């Protein structure tokens, strides 16, 4: 029985959405992972000329250069026009998300907080009733104090686990030098409460809770097509 790749459908939907709202890419902020690469390839297929893109990670910078984009230095730009990224989980009602599966949550959080328009693209399998249902909540922590930060997180009952990778020994370290720790929280009743709690833990640099940052979430469907969730921040198509 035939069907469609939800991520390809979501990438097409994001470009359609930009066309409907009259969004100019301008300086583009780009998340990390295969999802945003599909968006960029779809843009190229539609004849969108590569411009300046500010990456959230070194991995993204390499991909952008390979696709002909001018890679903007995040140390120079004060903000971006449009930010495009995927998500590990998305709560449709409020547009809340968990991100950081690729370990780039710090760069992704900064870029999305300094963007005029944020569009997140996901497959329908990423939708959840409550954040934490399917994936852990990642945090980036200071590398020199990992054990102490872990102790603080354990005392809060957050079930932390230092992320490891089969490609290397030791913990996963972000491009910004922080250690990635996954919190096995289970479904969250109060994501904002957890965000506030984590920000009061010394040594936590950033969290993978993306709350109040989405303008639109484009959901790709395996049955073909997509649906647009939002606007979440007062915009309208």
Swiss-Prot record:
Homodimer. It catalyses: aldehydo-D-ribose 5-phosphate = D-ribulose 5-phosphate. Its EC number is 5.3.1.6. It is an enzyme of class 5 (isomerase). Belongs to the ribose 5-phosphate isomerase family. The lineage of its organism: Archaea, Thermoproteota, Thermoprotei, Desulfurococcales, Desulfurococcaceae. GO terms for molecular function: ribose-5-phosphate isomerase activity. PANTHER family: RIBOSE-5-PHOSPHATE ISOMERASE. Substrate binds at residues 32-35, 85-88, 99-102, 126. The keyword Cell membrane does not apply. The active site is at residue 108. Catalyzes the reversible conversion of ribose-5-phosphate to ribulose 5-phosphate. Transmembrane segments: none annotated. One of its GO terms (cellular component) is cytosol. It holds the Pfam family Rib_5-P_isom_A. CDD domains: RPI_A. Signal peptide: none annotated. This is Ribose-5-phosphate isomerase A. Pathway: Carbohydrate degradation; pentose phosphate pathway; D-ribose 5-phosphate from D-ribulose 5-phosphate (non-oxidative stage): step 1/1.
């Amino acid at each position: 029985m035939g069907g469609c790749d939800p991520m390809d459908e979501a990438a097409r939907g994001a470009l359609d959405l930009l066309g409907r709202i009259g969004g100019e890419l301008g300086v583009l902020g780009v998340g990390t992972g295969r999802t945003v690469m599909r968006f960029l390839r779809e843009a190229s297929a539609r004849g969108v000329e590569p411009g300046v893109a500010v990456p959230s990670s070194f991995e993204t910078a390499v991909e952008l250069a390979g696709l002909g984009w001018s890679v903007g230095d995040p140390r120079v730009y004060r903000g971006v026009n449009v930010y495009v990224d995927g998500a590990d989980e998305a709560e449709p009602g409020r547009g809340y998300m968990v991100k950081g599966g690729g370990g780039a949550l710090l760069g992704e959080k900064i870029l999305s907080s300094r963007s005029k328009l944020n569009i997140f693209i996901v497959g329908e399998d990423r939708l959840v009733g409550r954040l934490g249902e399917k994936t852990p909540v990642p945090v980036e922590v200071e590398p020199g104090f990992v054990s102490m930060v872990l102790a603080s997180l354990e005392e809060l009952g957050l079930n932390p686990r230092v992320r490891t990778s089969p490609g290397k020994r030791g913990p996963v370290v972000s491009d910004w030098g922080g250690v990635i720790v996954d919190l096995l929280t289970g479904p969250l009743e109060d994501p904002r409460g957890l965000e506030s709690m984590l920000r009061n833990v010394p040594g936590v640099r950033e969290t993978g809770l993306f709350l109040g940052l989405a303008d639109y979430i484009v959901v790709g469907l395996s049955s073909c097509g997509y649906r647009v969730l939002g606007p979440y921040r007062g915009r309208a198509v």
